[in-house]
Amino acid sequence: MSPQTETKAGVGFKAGVKEYKLTYYTPEYETKDTDILAAFRVTPQPGVPPEERGAAVAAESSTGTWTTVWTDGLTSLDRYKGRCYHIEPVPGEEEQFIAYVAYPLDLFEEGSVTNMFTSIVGNVFGFKALRALRLEDLRIPVAYVKTFQGPPHGIQVERDKLNKYGRPLLGCTIKPKLGLSAKNYGRAVYECLRGGLDFTKDDENVNSQPFMRWRDRFLFCAEAIYKSQAETGEIKGHYLNATAGTCEEMIKRAVFARELGVPIVMHDYLTGGFTANTSLSHYCRDNGLLLHIHRAMHAVIDRQKNHGMHFRVLAKALRMSGGDHVHSGTVVGKLEGERDITLGFVDLLRDDYIEKDRSRGVYFTQDWVSLPGVLPVASRGIHVWHMPALTEIFGDDSVLQFGGGTLGHPWGNAPGAVANRVALEACVKARNEGRDLAAEGGEIIREACKWSP
């Protein structure tokens, strides 16, 4: 028996329930550079002090359980426990508060988003002492960031691969998303790419259904890519969705895409899971494939204001797990988001260092230590008349993705793609000439109509 164990065992063991705050509420604690920091929005049951509930969150997401156990004496709780180190009220919400929790780095497996989330959010959200709980933000320490590969390639490498600079990239989701045969699907891909788009996209629920098996879709889309490249002289791509029922099948589809010579594949990272996503990201880096990420199912997790997890946390997790693009909301269009809040997590995706800024929803300063950036994808419900606002809001390092805004053109798919490309280039040219896109956007688009269907 080690001296450490002998000493602790000699103190004795007293069973029973004790208040969490006696062990896990430590307002005097000074956070370490190696701690993972979390900001939780807590809505407690009536009559429970904030200190007790904040401590309960720290305990139940780290080393604690509902009672004292004798094996507590066999380890160092001071080394491994989570600590609620600060509590602040939520303006305008009398019953809510923000609990800040620090987790020692030793609690987490290196390079595993799966393990990080299992610890921090895996159990505590069902805690009956809380009416609701929402994870607003995480600070990932440099020491932990460096255990992740991150995106397969990143923004600059993608631009170099595509030879496209100085403007946002243009995409289109093929519609109807379900029911087309592989050949008709490939025809729509060709028409959009030939018209001037950089990418087309499988919808998130296009996998390998009876009406269109994945291998047939991959072959017809590859034919469309090569034909449009030959005719336009530009590099083109289609987000071939490799998401599958097993990791093995997913990798098999990615291997086939690589053998076809296409530049990019796609994954539904929340429904597919972080373990699968990280595996695919590693394969993509090793084999020169870009990786487009769809966030299908995100609203189940992030839509409720008081419960769940904010998308900025899912965005940080995606940058760690790996993806070159991720859908981020539009600020305009069918799925609007608060502008400042959206741009806050867009910066967390793209930039190397982001300062704390509560007005933009950024609770912690985040240093990514040169982890490659991720291109935000603005999509759903947008069209050419949104182009000035999108160009101004998202800047060059983004993907602007029009589904119905391309395929819904009265003259067909190719004219719809031409209209998008002309509108984008008109907005970029006007911006570079110093014109105000917010004030003159409508006029700029009307001028561009002279040269576009």
UniProtKB/Swiss-Prot annotation:
Q: What class of enzyme is it?
A: lyase
Query: Where are the active-site residues found?
Result: 175 (proton acceptor), 294 (proton acceptor)
Instruction: Report any one BP term from Gene Ontology.
Output: reductive pentose-phosphate cycle
For the modification N6-carboxylysine, the affected residues are 201
Q: Where in the cell is it found?
A: Plastid, Chloroplast
Q: Binding residues for substrate, per the UniProt record?
A: 123, 173, 177, 295, 327, 379
Query: InterPro entries under this entry?
Result: RuBisCO (IPR033966), RuBisCo_large_chain_AS (IPR020878), RuBisCO_lsu_C (IPR000685), RuBisCO_lsu_C_sf (IPR036376), RuBisCO_lsu_fd_N (IPR017443), RuBisCO_lsu_N_sf (IPR036422), RuBisCO_lsuI (IPR020888)
Mark which residues the record calls propeptide.
1-2
Residue positions where N6,N6,N6-trimethyllysine is found in the record = 14
Q: How does it assemble?
A: Heterohexadecamer of 8 large chains and 8 small chains; disulfide-linked. The disulfide link is formed within the large subunit homodimers.
Q: What is this protein called?
A: Ribulose bisphosphate carboxylase large chain
